Amino acid sequence: MRKNNTAIIFGSLFFSCSVMAANGTLAPTVVPMVNGGQASIAISNTSPNLFTVPGDRIIAVNSLDGALTNNEQTASGGVVVATVNKKPFTFILETERGLNLSIQAVPREGAGRTIQLVSDLRGTGEEAGAWETSTPYESLLVTISQAVRGGKLPAGWYQVPVTKETLQAPAGLSSVADAVWTGNHLKMVRFAVENKTLSALNIRESDFWQPGTRAVMFSQPASQLLAGARMDVYVIRDGEGN
């Protein structure tokens, strides 16, 4: 992928994203992790537990002490694990993209849990990497925005849960990340931006620039945000930005 000058892309982008838990079930627990890192996670020792790595597939489960009574891979790339242990133990998850995630399981009675292990996938995934490096830089940014808008992500790109993504908004504006899409070297984040003041504020895409930013897009053409109004701001970042 050839890096030219950073670019601001204009366009009307309309996206929607929703997450819903079925009645009577626990909502998924999102656990941020880094490759090679470890997390202490409470799991059920009376019901099965589901582990997933959004944007990746778990291909192996390793438990040296045999504490897992069962582990079964799902068609979607997750793994269902079960234990009757009462004491903490450790197991390792290996993924298709080359991640190794260490889980310090803390067993307890209760409903089975759904755990989403969210790791920064940038720098992994051969399919996304090949496409990103072979596409001219400006065309790459435009194609990513159009693909997400159309609901069909580029090859090797995935939507992942929000973790620590932030946006440095100008004075008077608040911002909250509500959706993330990631590839190999780049990721795209959607922020809900709101005018908290009692008057209209002038806004430009460049107002939302920060280290690692490669493109900023408004959900609709705008030069002002009215008092109390909200709009979506889409930011494409490289490996330097969160």
Curated annotation (Swiss-Prot):
Subcellular location, principal: membrane
Signal peptide, first to last residue: 1-16
Entries under InterPro entries matching the protein: TraK_C (IPR055397), TraK_Ftype (IPR014126), TraK_N (IPR010563)
Record's keyword terms, sorted: Cell outer membrane, Conjugation, Lipoprotein, Membrane, Palmitate, Plasmid, Signal
Keyword Ligase: no
Transport as UniProt keyword: no
Organism: Escherichia coli (strain K12)
Protein name according to UniProt: TraK lipoprotein
Membrane topology: Lipid-anchor
Compartment(s): Cell outer membrane
Biological role stated in the UniProt entry: Involved in pilus assembly.
Disulfide bonds: none
Domain of life: Bacteria
GO CC terms: cell outer membrane
Lipid-binding residues (covalent, S-diacylglycerol cysteine): C17
Lipidated residues (N-palmitoyl cysteine): C17
